[in-house]
Every structure is written in C-alpha cells, then in structure tokens.
Amino acid sequence: MNPIIDGIIALEGGYVFNPKDKGGATHWGITEATARAHGYAGDMRDLTHAEAYAILEEDYWIKPGFDVISTLSWPVSFELCDAAVNIGAYHPSAWLQRWLNVFNHEGKRNPDIHVDGNIGPRTLAALEHYLAWRGQEGEAVLVKALNCSQGTYYLNVAEKNHNNEQFIYGWIKNRVT
C-alpha cells in the first residue's frame, strides 16, 4: 500500500456532489469523468475504495512519474501527487520544473530544463542535483515553493470564477500544507 494514496483517500473522504464544483460528483477524490475514463459505469456513490485507490495510483502516482520522484524525495513526491489529484498532474510537474530552473543559480549548478509538465530524465537529474547540493533544507524549501505555486493557482481559479470562492478556504487549509 502507498501511504500517500491512503492519505489522499482519507482527506478526500466519501461521495460529494456540489453543483458549483465544475468537477461534478466525486468519490474518494475521483471525479465521475475520471472514473468513466477507467471504465467505471456505476453510480459514483458505489465506487469502492479499492477502485479509487487503483485509479489514484495509476493516474496521479505512476503515470506522471511521481513514484520515481519518491526514490529521490518522499516529501516532494507527496506534494506533487496531492496537488495532482486536485488539479491534474501537468501543473505540479511544471511547477517542479520551473522551481528547479530558478533554483539552479542561472544554470551554474545544472542546465535549465524544458518546462513541459512531463517528468523525464532531465527533470529527475535536475532534482537529484538540487537535492545533492541543498540537502534536507533544500528539500523543505522546494516543498514550500511548490506550495506557493499551488496557493497562487487556487487564488487565480477563485478570482476567475467566483463559484470557487466557497472552496478556496478548504483548498488552502487541506491542500497547501
């Protein structure tokens, strides 16, 4: 079992449907659209914990490469996965790439990487170099930096669509940690 996925399921909880939430009905953090994309045809209230776990692990842990990042940094992988469940994997992956680029001392520590939202060998190498250079303190700073990006993302979402104002307090409280 993956404690990150278990924690996300515990945080997301059971079935929720709020008409103002553009994600629609969710259960265990899985939107109906995502469940359907995985072949689930039942009522969202009936989505099992095991089905949700499998979807979360595939879409928000393995596919984006956060499982590989966990071999370098468990805290960074947790932050990326948790954000991805809430907003998709592209943004957290791109934030990581952007932060690694600006933390590299103008390319003196390692070359800039292309910001494409895909975790590949260059992103992994940049993260490995950063962590070797900055250590545990740098790891904690990187997690804070990712949280800064996530908070800014939520602020922009709420400002663009006022229906999201009812969600932003909870997003900041539960997701920007």
What are these regions (language model features)?
Residues M1-T177:
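Cell-wall polysaccharide-cleaving catalytic domain and substrate-binding groove, primarily
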